[in-house]
Amino acid sequence: MKQYLDLARHIMENGTLKSDRTGTGTKSIFGYQMFFDLKDGFPLLTTKKTFLKGIIHELLWFIKGDTNIKYLVDNNVGIWTDWPYKNYMNSSEYQGESIKEFSDKIRQSDEFAKKWGDLGPVYGSQWRNFNGVDQIEYIINTLKTNPDSRRMVLSAWNPAEIGQMMLPPCHTLIQFYVVDNKLSLQLYQRSGDVFLGIPFNIASYAVFLMMVAQVTGFELGSFVHTIGDAHIYTNHFDQINLQLTRTPRRLPILKINKSITRLEDFKYEDFELVGYDPYPPIKGVVAV
């Protein structure tokens, strides 16, 4: 997608080198916005193959209100495993297990998963129980009864519980907007890992917009992506430069099961990606 490559190029050309929490180092800018009209296709990156299975399972996990990686691990999605594994490695119970062996223990033992697989009150907890408020339910009800409301805001940032989370929310605030019977969504993301995270976030919130539009009866509008600290880790420079040599291809189409009328009823099998023709994947190490 041109919007994504423009962001990456802008950071590489104009970003500032900064230190960061992980000790890796980044090139960073502050304040950037991208627009995606969903009538142009599903915004899944074509300049490298992107893990849609992980994106959809993670979103379903959020909607369930789940905060334990067991659901993800059971579905062979390891995008959140690094953080609890690091926590386990620092414990007295660690006996040299690899991350694969740790994942196997999560998969095989409910007791082990309960003790070591929970991330604290991260996204799913805040979406479904922010100090007792089910924000998803509120937004769905408001879209159905008062779609011109300016209060259709979903927040994952709960200052009182940040210290209990293994990783504080990066994509923090969502707002819905309706005009001409079209539903749009804007995301504010406080921190964006441009190589590994941002492609996931674009696709994830596009899927979320499609799901919410379907269950509330609206047509699709636009996804607006606003990023605070947009950064490229120094150990991803080569991967980003490779992507910048690739010409974006036609966007795919994401089909979803039209019979679903409740967000909670969606399953992975209800999504079908059509016409996806990406370049080969590009690997990169996540900064934990």
Swiss-Prot record:
Family: Belongs to the thymidylate synthase family. Bacterial-type ThyA subfamily.
Pfam family, one: Thymidylat_synt
Keyword Nucleus: no
Top EC class for this record: transferase
Annotated InterPro entries: Thymidate_synth/dCMP_Mease, Thymidate_synth/dCMP_Mease_dom, Thymidate_synth/dCMP_Mease_sf, Thymidylate_synthase, Thymidylate_synthase_AS
Function text: Catalyzes the reductive methylation of 2'-deoxyuridine-5'-monophosphate (dUMP) to 2'-deoxythymidine-5'-monophosphate (dTMP) while utilizing 5,10-methylenetetrahydrofolate (mTHF) as the methyl donor and reductant in the reaction, yielding dihydrofolate (DHF) as a by-product. This enzymatic reaction provides an intracellular de novo source of dTMP, an essential precursor for DNA biosynthesis.
Positions contributing to (6R)-5,10-methylene-5,6,7,8-tetrahydrofolate binding: 193, 287
Complex formation: Homodimer.
GO biological process, one term: dTMP biosynthetic process
Binding of dUMP, residues: 21, 150-151, 190-193, 201, 231-233
Enzyme active site: 170 (nucleophile)
Catalytic reactions on record: dUMP + (6R)-5,10-methylene-5,6,7,8-tetrahydrofolate = 7,8-dihydrofolate + dTMP
Subcellular location: Cytoplasm
Gene transcribed to yield this protein: thyA
Keyword Ribonucleoprotein (UniProt): no
Main location as per UniProt: cytoplasm
Protein's recorded name: Thymidylate synthase
Matches recorded under PANTHER family: THYMIDYLATE SYNTHASE 1
